[in-house]
Curated annotation (Swiss-Prot):
Gene Ontology MF terms: metal ion binding; ubiquinol-cytochrome-c reductase activity
InterPro entries xref list: Cyt_b/b6_C, Cyt_b/b6_C_sf, Cyt_b/b6_N, Cytb/b6-like_sf, Cytochrome_b, Cytochrome_b_C_euk/bac, Cytochrome_b_N_euk/bac, Di-haem_cyt_TM
Keywords assigned by UniProt, alphabetized: Electron transport, Heme, Iron, Membrane, Metal-binding, Mitochondrion, Mitochondrion inner membrane, Respiratory chain, Transmembrane, Transmembrane helix, Transport, Ubiquinone
Biological process annotations from GO: mitochondrial electron transport, ubiquinol to cytochrome c
Pfam families: Cytochrom_B_C, Cytochrome_B
Lineage per the UniProt record: Eukaryota, Metazoa, Chordata, Craniata, Vertebrata
Organism: Allocebus trichotis (Hairy-eared dwarf lemur)
Record's miscellaneous remark: Heme 1 (or BL or b562) is low-potential and absorbs at about 562 nm, and heme 2 (or BH or b566) is high-potential and absorbs at about 566 nm.
Subunit structure: The cytochrome bc1 complex contains 11 subunits: 3 respiratory subunits (MT-CYB, CYC1 and UQCRFS1), 2 core proteins (UQCRC1 and UQCRC2) and 6 low-molecular weight proteins (UQCRH/QCR6, UQCRB/QCR7, UQCRQ/QCR8, UQCR10/QCR9, UQCR11/QCR10 and a cleavage product of UQCRFS1). This cytochrome bc1 complex then forms a dimer.
Family as reported in the entry's similarity comment: Belongs to the cytochrome b family.
Binding site for heme b b566: H97, H196
Record-listed heme b b562 binding positions: H83, H182
Protein name: Cytochrome b
Transmembrane segments: 33-53, 77-98, 113-133, 178-198, 226-246, 288-308, 320-340, 347-367
């Protein structure tokens, strides 16, 4: 008799995606982060739902409702910090996942790569709106500063900002709509994830060698289910260490002060996962130029497949490209550090240098080095 998982309409889809899926036999732990991102999304949706049960999206009570969750709701503080630090884990896995795609040439699967970029943008938008909801000082001023960037758009900028705000400043209307979008977007992300997987399973996964693996496949279960489970346990260990021992390590102390439109915090800065883009934004003295650089810093991922000049797909056997990749990683770490520093000498100069290096590496240096490697290998 045929196993039910192979004939039942719903189970068949699950079976072909997670059980009998033919997977390359040599994919390393860098391929674990896709499943970890799925786990992060599940954690965020579940904890977010329980937070939404107790939260009120009103300027007068938002801060108090978050305080009430932490003080009075049974295990409320755990749920709140799981959600806040879960976002950090989400972005950590996202950055590693994208980095792995760049290193091993996964961008040669264009549909999967482009859906991934749309997912990155959507997750960033969701996280930004979520940061506004506790209605602390950094929530309010972060929302004001970031939404105000749209006023740099010629002609329609000011009208657009007021339309997003729902008034002439960040207020009750802004908070209500941000809560509505923050609630609905994770479900849109879940739908995009399914499309991402659909396109991935059309072609099959890439592997560390970057070569065709049709001749050497193994079933996803039990080999990679066990491997993913180990990754999940390590992720949960890191997340629970943060939640139970250092819950405020990645947060901002200013967000424990209720939002006050009359008092600007000394240093307005976003969460750590946006600091690299914030540093690029601040490195350009012109407002419109800064906004364009900010958007381009993420959108540049879309043209990476066109900038791929190497004859080999993966960087596994390309030591010069590897060095450039790790310089890019170090540069992004530098930008993240600079984003959290005040706008003064020498941080301005370091930020500008790191921003120029970021764009130069992706647009000029890495493609040129790849061409050099082709010559060296006589390809």
């Amino acid at each position: 008799m045929t196993n039910i998982r192979k004939i039942h309409p719903l189970m068949k889809v699950m079976n072909n995606s997670f059980i009998d899926l033919p997977a390359p036999s040599n994919i390393s732990s860098w391929w674990n982060f896709g499943s970890l991102l799925g786990a992060c999304l599940a954690i965020q949706i579940i904890t977010g739902l329980f937070l939404a049960i107790h939260y009120t999206a009103d300027t007068m009570t938002a801060f108090s409702s978050v305080s009430h969750i932490c003080r009075d709701v049974n295990q409320g503080w755990t749920i709140r910090y799981l959600h806040a630090n879960g976002a950090s884990m989400f972005f950590l896995c996202l950055f590693i996942h994208v980095g792995r795609g760049m290193y091993y040439g996964s961008f040669t699967l264009p549909e999967t790569w482009n859906i991934g970029i749309i997912l990155l943008f959507t997750v960033m938008a969701t996280a930004f709106m979520g940061y506004v909801l506790p209605w602390g000082q950094m929530s309010f001023w972060g929302a004001t500063v970031i939404t105000n960037l749209l006023s740099a758009i010629p002609y329609i900028g000011t009208s657009l900002v007021e339309w997003i705000w729902g008034g002439f400043s960040v207020d009750k209307a802004t908070l209500t709509r941000f809560f509505a979008f923050h609630f609905i977007l994770p479900f849109i992300i879940a739908a995009l994830v399914m499309i991402h997987l659909l396109f991935l399973h059309e072609t099959g996964s890439n592997n560390p060698l970057g070569i065709a693996s049709e001749s050497d496949k193994i079933p996803f279960h039990p080999y990679y289910t066990i491997k993913d489970l180990l990754g999940l346990l390590l992720l949960l260990l890191l997340l629970m260490t943060l939640v139970l021992f250092f819950p405020d390590l990645l947060g901002d102390p200013d967000n424990y002060t209720p939002a006050n439109p009359l008092n600007t915090p000394p240093h307005i800065k976003p969460e750590w996962y946006f600091l690299f883009a914030y540093a690029i934004l601040r490195s350009i003295p012109n407002k419109l130029g800064g906004v364009l650089a900010l958007i381009t810093s993420i959108l540049i991922l879309t043209i990476i497949p066109m900038l791929h000049t190497a004859k080999q797909r993966s960087m596994t056997f390309r030591p010069l490209s590897q060095i450039m990749f790790w310089i890019l990683t170090a540069d992004l770490s530098t930008l993240t550090w600079i984003g959290g520093q005040p706008v003064e000498h020498p941080f301005i100069y370091i930020g500008q240098t790191a921003s120029i290096l970021y764009f130069s590496l992706i647009l000029i240096i890495i493609p040129t080095v790849s061409l050099m490697e082709n010559k060296m290998l006589k390809w």
